[in-house]
Curated annotation (Swiss-Prot):
Name under which the protein is recorded: Large ribosomal subunit protein bL19
Listed InterPro entries: Ribosomal_bL19 (IPR001857), Ribosomal_bL19_CS (IPR018257), Ribosomal_bL19_sf (IPR038657), Translation_prot_SH3-like_sf (IPR008991)
Organism per entry: Mycoplasmoides gallisepticum (strain R(low / passage 15 / clone 2))
Similarity annotation: Belongs to the bacterial ribosomal protein bL19 family.
Function: This protein is located at the 30S-50S ribosomal subunit interface and may play a role in the structure and function of the aminoacyl-tRNA binding site.
Keywords recorded for this protein, A-Z: Ribonucleoprotein, Ribosomal protein
GO MF, one annotated term: structural constituent of ribosome
SUPFAM superfamilies referenced in this protein's UniProt entry, alphabetically: Translation proteins SH3-like domain
Amino acid sequence: MNKLNKQNIINHVNNLQLKKSVPNFQVGDTVSVSIKIADEKRTRIQKFDGLVLRRKGSGLSETFIVRKESSGVGVEKNFHVHNPNIEIELKRKGKVRRAYISYMRERSGKSARIKEKVVNTK
């Protein structure tokens, strides 16, 4: 098998595993990620609501970081966009001018607010 055929097979398998319905979210948006957790006896869904700090990569390896404040402590989680065990729901569009808003880690209270993006639906 030559190299071109191997690459075609790899691309085909990757395309089969991509999610069909990924919401159009960006850095600065507020999302709710529902994580399906399989325990020994049952499966449950855990929600993680927060701000998207970064979206990175492409294809199956595309990831994003969500940050939230829980009991005064900042919590960040990395997720794969095409993970079959998560569902992403867009709650609010934010207006930022960076691809990675790491400065939000030092912010709290009113300084941690992000302007809401107004979307025209004409």
